Amino acid sequence: YDIDTVRTEIAKTDDAFTLSSKFGTPKFYNIKDICFGAKRAQQGSSLSLRELMDIGMFLREVSGLDEWYSQCSGIQTSLTEYFEQLSVNKHLENMITNAIISEEELADSASPQLAAIRRSIQRKSLAVRERLDKLIKSQSTQKYLQESLVTMRDGRFVVPVKTEYKSEISGLVHDTSATGATLFIEPMAVVEANNEIRVLQIEEQKEIERIIKEMSELVGSFAEPMINDYEIV
């Protein structure tokens, strides 16, 4: 390092200490490297929920840093030019943080369409369960069942039927127990409703993919300022 570079770095450190003494130290949490994800989005790729979450958290950190620096307005330091280069994007930050619950799940609030689809799935699933609950509680049916419960196989509601009684419960066989003593049968009475739920689940997945694509496109359009922010921070 030449002497000017050393002096500049010392000045930055001194100024950072001075600002922190006056206004408190800005809080930094676990900032992930968002450059790779930002560049992928810029090239048209859909990002994973994990990548989007990291970008949302990074944007929140930039917002926090910008808010902290707003207290220091009017104070010129060797750090001023860096703070003034920060690009805050509250719209994208809020869109991501409000839409994503975890790296595996989007919130219902991610879009009105997603919320509506999920309400329909919930309503139809409840109706199927109620119908099957009546079936398994019926005295005439209980003797055919291995257990009085409703379970799931391949995303469809089924009941566990003793193999020797399979002809007594009209329906579609989806699975067999390891011992072969139990068949998991989807009673014909709920096949159509289960089909409707499956169609809704496909619609739900398509809507999730659309939302992720939309957020990724916004990330892509803001990639350069974000990468610049990352290099500053």
Map each language-model feature to its residues:
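Conserved amphipathic alpha-helical "coupling/scaffold" segments
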Residues: 1-113, 117, 228-233
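Non-transmembrane amphipathic alpha-helical segments
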Residues: 13, 96, 121-124, 128-131, ...
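Ordered, soluble secondary-structure elements with a strong preference for glycine-centered loop motifs
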Residues: 25, 49, 115, 119, ...
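Intracellular alpha-helical coupling/juxtamembrane segments of multi-pass membrane proteins
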Residues: 121-124, 204-211, 215-233
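SMC-family hinge/dimerization module
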Residues: 149, 153-184, 194
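Internal alpha/beta scaffold segment
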Residues: 188-214
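Coiled-coil heptad-register positions
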Residues: 21, 70, 136-139, 208, ...
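Extended, Lys/Arg-enriched charged tracts that mediate electrostatic binding to polyanionic substrates
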Residues: 115-165
